[in-house]
């Protein structure tokens, strides 16, 4: 795998250079990361069959990065689980899905996963176990490394059936994305050694942007721990101490930072590049960033988890940001072709909106253990005389005359909120499982062209015993046991019934038009 070879070369030539640094103080150099992942990979190879998923559990811990690399070296896909944002029942659901032929899944746990209730049987390596294995040393056989169509990682995303679905990204997808990622980094004005901001949870595919780019280029991941991100003052101090040169985040995170007047070039004098992905970049956010960071450039990108993070990019100029038109998300990367199709799957003319179809060498293998779902949205094609996979995104977009993609939103029940992809059907399914709920639907509320919050429309199964406000609070507390925080509706509206259309279907448009 080229990605591992890149890191190996850096570890050999610049072994004492920091590879991962966390805002709370922990740090590992390249030689420490390489040696530790070698030793852990040897253990995994001796105890886990090649190709069997291994869970890596924690939050912004350097040993999670060690775990990712160790899995790749051992020939096993890693499954990242953020211990802060992913609730217990969701962890249990993911664990059940990756259980291999009745065996207990191996978990590399940098935090205590034994506190998670309702978990199936696990083989857990605690932090103490991991340290013991690393101290013992060792390395796997080189032929255990993943390559080609081997699965590199599995990211579980929102699923409409009420259970998360695992997106399988191959080693070749990862390598192809990484090569493009390194090209994008050149916008920062240097070849390597840059410090990359690592803010998104590792269970969110945006984090692969910096995992790939930083380590393959000899740079450093500067990880913002949960404890840092929950305090505005601590976060500002951490950013000031980071010396970050390449910023990777959702636009929403940057927008939160912009609320502080101190967030400007003087705070981050080395910052030269903003890379945004995961949701729509508002013109005002781009404009304010370019004003406050005159030495930095802004890249807007687009891509679902199923196409390895991102497949398009474009630089946003001050003139574009100051305009009234929504910002484009750019042209496709090498090895990728975009099509816009109508409801019948026929190509749309330039300037016409339709469904975005991605064809290329970073399209995922499919959904883990779900051939039924895979066959619905994945296919095959040929790009640059090479056979590739295709993915129907469910996104609405348009290609202009210059080949630039313009993204307008989701065609189905999927929405993006603060950069997180959410399947409204999954929230509805969890609501319906509650005994106090007879029927439920979830809609997204919009403000200034993007999703501001979620609204749950609930038909109660019994008369309300408290005020609607207090009943709504209790309902949201119940949901927190099964859903991540970003999927919890902000508002709960109790109704006698849900509106229907003339053909007997739920009138989602009517619900969405309700003011909340």
Residue ranges with predicted function:
Residues 58-62, 204, 489:
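Substrate-binding/gating loop at the entrance of the active-site cleft, primarily
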Residues 21-24, 275-277, 418:
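Glycine-rich Rossmann NAD(P)(H)-binding loop
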Residues 63, 68, 76-95, 137-347, ...:
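Motif- and composition-driven signal specific to adenylation
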Residues 54, 107-108, 196, 247, ...:
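Receiver (REC) domain switch-region micro-motif
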Residues 2-4, 100-144, 174, 297-300, ...:
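AMP-dependent adenylate-forming
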Residues 50, 103, 243, 267-270, ...:
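Short loop/turn motifs at secondary-structure junctions
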Residues 14, 260, 293, 371, ...:
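Acidic-histidine catalytic/liganding microenvironments
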């Amino acid at each position: 795998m080229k990605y591992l070879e890149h890191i190996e070369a850096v570890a050999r030539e610049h072994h004492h250079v920091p590879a991962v640094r966390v805002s709370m103080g922990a740090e590992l150099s390249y030689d420490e990361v390489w040696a530790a992942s070698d030793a852990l990979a040897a253990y995994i190879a001796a105890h886990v069959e090649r190709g069997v998923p291994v869970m890596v559990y924690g939050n912004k811990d350097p040993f999670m990065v060690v775990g990712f690399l160790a899995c790749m070296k051992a020939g096993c896909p890693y499954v990242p689980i953020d211990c802060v944002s992913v609730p217990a029942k969701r962890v249990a659901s993911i664990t059940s899905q990756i259980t291999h032929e009745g065996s207990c899944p191996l978990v590399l746990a940098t935090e205590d996963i034994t506190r998670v209730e309702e978990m199936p049987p696990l083989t857990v390596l605690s932090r103490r176990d991991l340290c013991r294995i690393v101290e013992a040393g060792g390395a796997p056989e080189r032929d255990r490394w993943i390559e080609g169509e081997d699965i590199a990682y599995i990211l579980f995303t929102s699923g409409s059936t009420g259970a998360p679905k695992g997106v399988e990204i191959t080693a070749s997808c990862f390598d192809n994305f990484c090569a493009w990622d390194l090209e994008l980094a050149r916008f920062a004005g240097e070849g390597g050694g840059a410090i990359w901001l690592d803010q998104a949870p590792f269970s969110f595919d945006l984090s692969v942007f910096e995992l790939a780019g930083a380590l393959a280029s000899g740079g450093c991941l500067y990880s913002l721990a949960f404890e840092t991100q929950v305090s505005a003052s601590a976060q500002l101090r951490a950013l000031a101490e980071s010396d970050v040169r390449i910023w990777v985040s959702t636009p929403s995170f940057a927008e939160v930072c912009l609320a502080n007047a101190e967030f400007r070039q003087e705070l981050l004098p080395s910052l030269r590049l903003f890379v945004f992905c995961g949701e729509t970049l508002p013109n005002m956010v781009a404009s304010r960033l370019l004003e406050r960071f005159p030495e930095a450039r802004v890249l807007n990108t687009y891509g679902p988890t199923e196409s390895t993070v991102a497949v398009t990019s474009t630089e946003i100029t001050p003139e574009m940001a100051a305009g009234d038109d929504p910002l484009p998300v750019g042209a496709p990367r090498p090895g990728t072709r975009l099509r816009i199709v109508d409801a019948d799957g026929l190509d749309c003319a330039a300037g016409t909106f339709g469904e975005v179809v991605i064809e290329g060498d970073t399209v995922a293998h499919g959904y883990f253990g779900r051939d039924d779902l895979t066959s619905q949205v994945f296919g095959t094609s040929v790009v640059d005389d090479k056979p590739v996979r295709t993915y129907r995104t469910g996104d609405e977009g348009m290609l202009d005359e210059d080949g630039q993609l313009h993204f307008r939103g989701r065609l189905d029940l999927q929405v993006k909120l603060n950069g997180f992809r959410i399947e409204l059907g999954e929230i509805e399914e969890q609501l319906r499982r509650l005994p106090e709920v007879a029927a439920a639907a979830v809609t997204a509320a919009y403000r200034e062209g993007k999703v501001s919050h979620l609204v749950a429309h609930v038909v109660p199964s019994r008369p309300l015993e408290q005020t609607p406000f207090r009943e709504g609070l209790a309902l949201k507390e119940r949901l927190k046991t099964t859903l991540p925080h970003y999927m919890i509706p902000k508002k709960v509206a109790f109704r006698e019934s849900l509106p229907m259309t003339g053909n007997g279907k739920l009138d989602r448009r009517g619900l969405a038009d309700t003011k909340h």
